[in-house]
Amino acid sequence: LEELIEIDNLDNKLIQNFCYALSKIYFDIDKIEPGFKLLKKAKTAYTALNNYSISEEKNHFIKVKQYFLSNKFPKSDFNNTFKKIPIFIIGMPRSGTSLIEQIVSTHSKVYGAGELTILPKIIHNSIWDKNTNPQELLNFVREEYLSKISKLNTNKEFIIDKMPFNFFYVGFILNSIPEAKIIHMHRNPMAICWSNYKANFFDNIGMDYAHKLETIGEFYVIYNETMKFWNEIYPNSLIEVDYDNFVMDYVSGSKSIIEDLGLNWEDKVLKFHENNRAVETNSLLQVRYQVYQNSSKNWKKYEKYLTPVIEILKNNNIKF
């Protein structure tokens, strides 16, 4: 691999893949400096092939915020009912959403559907940012989501939708699907940012921000501001779970989540690592084994290389 990445005029896609693979080898044997250099080279190769600007996410949050500040959402009595109740798990990628989905989906009444793109597509296909009547919008979102989720191949009563980026749409969920549950995952901000940077997100939709430390920091700020906004206008509406506290006592944490969801406790929930449902995220190893602790401290080994994201978090008063 070391010889391959030195070949002149090597395709950027190959540079990306070779450098990433080699960086992981170096990190595994604690050779941090060469590992980080190769990781950065892999990320640079990716950004050379992809034109990305964080401004789209910033503008998206501004539009959502303005819409909810300028409209009133009366409580609605909907004619249609959900036979399969959605459980949304939201938060930053790498905040523990996959682990919680694996645990909760081990319950006999819950089906883990993974990262569904249903809700973002519905919102994007609506005209909520063009002075849409709020009631019409709520009906549209509800009907469309109900239609899509009813087609999932399961008879279980609860469906987990683990699309992390649904944090943008908390207000839409609360008003159009009031029977839904929303679990919001927290984790140490630097642990999240470092984990986003070092993860292999090259082929993941929506993860273009994760290939530069600066855009990771800026995206985290957007996420933080978005959740702060939802908590201000809809206080105490979410099931809040701190990943670091959860892994210290996942037995009590699991029981608390199951209770908050209104489900009866089942001991098999604690055997989540035996749940052989398909997992298609970077968290595969985490959900296949017992919970491990202290992973949120790993970023400190790489701290001197993470200055750009550290400065962004500090400048926005985000503690870590």
Residue ranges: model-predicted function:
Residues 168-171, 194, 251:
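Short N-terminal helix/helix-N-cap motif within the alpha/beta-hydrolase-1
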Residues 79-175, 185:
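Phosphate-binding active sites in nucleotide-utilizing proteins
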Residues 112, 182, 238-240:
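Conserved beta-strand scaffold positions in the cores of enzyme catalytic domains, especially
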Residues 2-13, 18-86, 132, 139-153, ...:
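PAPS-dependent sulfotransferases, especially Golgi type II membrane carbohydrate sulfotransferases
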Residues 164-165, 245-249:
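Acidic, metal-coordinating catalytic cores used for nucleic-acid/nucleotide bond scission
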Residues 117-118, 187-192, 246-248:
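Conserved nucleotide-binding/hydrolysis micro-motifs of P-loop NTPases
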